[in-house]
């Protein structure tokens, strides 16, 4: 869980640099932090996929997946589905959440037990970042992606505080 939260915060710093109007909204109204966390989880979650095993034969779109087969669920793709999320490649902390739901922590019996803790840690971190870096730039030349297949994010996010 610690790995995913730190990657979410790094993803947030880069995403808000790409969408400074959204960072400005948070600066003006910190009550939007929980919604921002949900949108960040949709926009670029640290967990981009999940693997499940079929318990029986399943037929989807004319293709049968046999029982006991591994299935790769690309949740990162699902959260960018334009049928569920208008303008899905845009970070929008005021996004309507009635249609699409958050798959970042799994779903149903496979939901992450640490989801509430991760959300709380992320809220605390964003609140602190608003104090520490109200205006900033990301040094894109110094960005480094993690070399992990199960977690998506940055191992290095150099920032420069604007004064």
What are these regions (language model features)?
Residues 2-163:
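Cytochrome P450
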